[in-house]
Amino acid sequence: GFNPCGETCQIDQTCHAPGCTCSIANICVRN
């Protein structure tokens, strides 16, 4: 399935998908 949080966030520490947050591993996950 499609993961709306599939982006990484090591560059600017932000996730552009709604309802997603940057994890410690610099991967966007659902919050």
Swiss-Prot record:
GO terms for biological process: defense response. Disulfide bonds join 5-20, 9-22, 15-28. This is a cyclic peptide. InterPro entries: Cyclotide (IPR005535), Cyclotide_sf (IPR036146). There is a cross-link at residues 1-31 (Cyclopeptide (Gly-Asn)). The keyword Disulfide bond applies. Keywords: Disulfide bond, Knottin, Plant defense. The presence of a 'disulfide through disulfide knot' structurally defines this protein as a knottin. Probably participates in a plant defense mechanism. Belongs to the cyclotide family. This is Cyclotide psybry C.
